[in-house]
Amino acid sequence: MKSIRTRLTLFFLLICVGCLAIAMAVSSIFSRSALTDTNDRLHEQQAEYYASMIDSWLQENTGDVDAACTFLEAKSLIDEVTIRPVMEQYTNNNVNAINVNVGFENKLFIDGTGWKPEAGWDCTGRPWYTDAKAAGGEKYFGDPYVDAVTGELIISVSKMFHTGSDMEGVVNMDLKLSTLFDMMNEITDTSDGSYSFIYNENGAILMHPNSEFISTGENVVNVSDLIGGAYEKAMTSQRAFTDYDGKAKYLKAATVAGSGWKEVLVTPVAAYNSAANEMLMVLVVVTVLSSVIAAVLVILYAGSITKP
């Protein structure tokens, strides 16, 4: 009789534990998949939010370029006496602009700081002028350089226009990025080891927690060259990569609408999967406790039905 009770106990116990284990495995697979999808969307939305904040900052701080173009498009006569005070006003009113200036196809150049070029200096050959022409009336955000006076990272933001007399010209702003970087460092959640970085449409790194990765005028660091191209590969594959600090991480990238820049959010794998791992641990604990309870019930039940 004892043998029968033992065998019945083991039989029912194996059935109960087996069913619980199968249920846990199936539940963990589907739950982990659902959590991973939710996590992906969450980090995508976070990157898109950061990108929208960058775009808002850029539009707010480069609005004077659009305003200056509108002012000049309404003018039929190019009069330095009336144009210079306007450029000076735009320069003085924007704390993030080093200067706002304008160049015309006849090589006339008017600078908002009052600077006047030497004879023979040709504004139409400057990159900000030629790049704005190539952009066809859209604002062009140039590659970064370091200002010789302030040591800050600067970009040129330029836009082509035509005056009322159909003379071509380009408005240019030299924009400091330090305030933008301060804002991004403030809003980016780094509590789990995440960080964000920014690169422009040419791939030049503008902002990165590793100062060695940031572009300057003499040394433009391209995102495709960093960590053996690991950033670009991870963006394409959506798989984890080994970061410069040796840790496995995921990344999500979002486009900054008005400039073509990219905002990239980098998150450690451990933080990325923490919710799924916590859920799996809960399932394991529940399964173990359920198995213990089932075992006790099976033993009691088997004992009752095998009594003489």
Predicted regions and their residues:
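Solvent-exposed, extracytoplasmic
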Residues: 80-93, 170, 174-214
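Cytoplasm-proximal transmembrane signaling helix
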Residues: 12-17, 262-264, 269-308
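Extracytoplasmic/periplasmic ligand-binding sensor regions of membrane-associated signaling proteins
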Residues: 92-96, 110-187, 241-243
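Extreme N-terminal signal-anchor transmembrane helix of membrane signaling/transducer proteins, especially
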Residues: 2-33, 37, 284-293, 297
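Extracellular/periplasmic juxtamembrane segments that couple receptor/chemosensory ectodomains to their
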Residues: 212, 218-281
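Extracytoplasmic/periplasmic sensory segments of membrane signal-transduction proteins
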Residues: 41-48, 53-138
